[in-house]
Amino acid sequence: MVNKMSVIGLQQIKKSYADGNQMRDVICDLNLTVEPQEFVAILGPSGSGKSTLLSIAGLLLSADSGEIIIGGQNLTNVKQSEWTKKRLELLGFIFQDHQLLPYMKIGDQLEMVAKLKGEKDASKRKEEVKGLLAELGIENCYGQYPNQMSGGQKQRAAIARAFIGNPQLILADEPTASLDPERGKEIAQLIQREVKSKHKSAIMVTHDRSVLEYVDTVYEMKKGKLVRL
């Protein structure tokens, strides 16, 4: 049940794709509510609809039907330009691949994101970025290019990018998949700390059951719906 305090509410979401001459239901009448300071994990085999669900929650993909409510705002039928604005304002994304630009230093990349999110003051952008990198233990990477960093450092930089602008909701798609188990746990713990200390929420799609100790609620995608475990 979505209430005024819920960070995100998905109600009766449906999504189908063409599969040859037929339509295949990927998401069927799915409901999900995430509250402030709640860290949710979604499990399920490849092709079960987990990433599709995350794309709908992240305003990257339209559902065929149903309602999307984020931050108390019904965003189901708004224009794409408004979706872009709300993504920048309300959401932070972490991907399996860090997707850092190889030709820009980390500090410059993150400050560019801060500018896109509305911070006009260059000194404040630099202060925010340096603060986030310090919180994540990679302050020495500020002036480095991605090819000078380890895999774990690059994923931490990607997490810093997601945290810029203080978004209400963090969406993470297999953020630990390319890391060894210990580094994967560190990444999940960093997301958990951000959620709890800064009154945010997070949804993480994962195959990695070793990180579930850091989440509050676990669901599994089954036949297009979420089953709570």
Tell what function each PLM region has.
Residues 58:
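Helix-to-loop junction immediately C-terminal to a conserved catalytic motif
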Residues 145-149, 153:
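Conserved ABC ATPase signature
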Residues 170-173:
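Catalytic Walker B motif of ABC-type/P-loop ATPase nucleotide-binding domains
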Residues 104-113:
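Short coil-to-helix segment of the ABC ATPase nucleotide-binding domain corresponding to the Q-loop/switch region
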Residues 164-168:
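A short, proline-enriched helix->beta-strand linker immediately N-terminal to the Walker B motif
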